[in-house]
Amino acid sequence: MMRMPPFTLHTPASLDEALEIASNLQDAEKEFDWVAGGTDLLPNYKWHLNSKKNVISLANVTELFELKATHIGAMVRLHELVESEVVHPVLAKAASMIASVLIRRSGTVGGNICLDTRCYWFNQSEDWRESIDWCHKCDCGTEADCRVIPNQNTLCVATYQADLAPVLMCLDATIHLASSTGTRSMQLTDFFELDGMTRNKLQPGELVTHLTIPKDSAQWQGDYQKLRQRESWDFPEAGVAVMWKRNGVNAPNDIRVATTGLESIPGFHQSQAQHALEDWNGKESIMSLAESIRKAVKPVQNTWYTPSYRRKMTRILTKRACAGLLEDSK
């Protein structure tokens, strides 16, 4: 049986209280984690993956639960996205493909966006990691080498495998952050860091409060396609979101493409999408776009499927996600 290491649970009732607790822990030089739904953090704690002595629960921070068409709180549950009548249908579809019904009842939007990167050598029990002389991402105190790209201890290539980010990136979402020193916001496309250990631009003591989506998001159509081992459970081995906008003509006047499950960050493929718009030719342009996305992604051997297969499937997923472009032009 995998037992969680002991920790102190803090249960603030407001955002200000949560940030104050975080600030006090920092001043005392005590490490901590935020916990939202706990569907990722708590299993990692059972595996003794970077566990902390203090955990701050956001379950009672009501400011983070708001859900509107243009505002999605960090504590909104995934099943709420699926069932909502105001959420963009492509975002609702992506949410419906996350894990299982039970996990979607607990998992949150903020937790999915900030999902820890995953790797075959990292997401294992402590005994398993010890048997292969530890892992660079978790067991840094052992001076362990990276098991995916050996002989370098500067970069972690663990894979980002969350589903919501590519759709939200295509919807031009802005992510909003808060800490005891103030608030800030940035485009979601700028939030992620190309390192499996750093992961994103959250500073110590900072948390995600909500995401905002432009009011014109309803004008965008699209789809999200996902490759996984089991349809009812697994993280994406590859995921592709494609969104487009028309002005009553056959050719789209804008296209956005984003990917997940292929690198340490979700990819936003603006140049490939814009190139596809030039001299648009329906199916041929879609085939060219799909091939350019396949060439752009750089998966490594740290998930169940091989990098070559995931790249090939990225091309197929892109074509599938673009199917609506051909239907709309008929």
Language-model-detected regions and their locations in the chain:
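C-terminal structural segment of proteins
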Residues: M1-K330
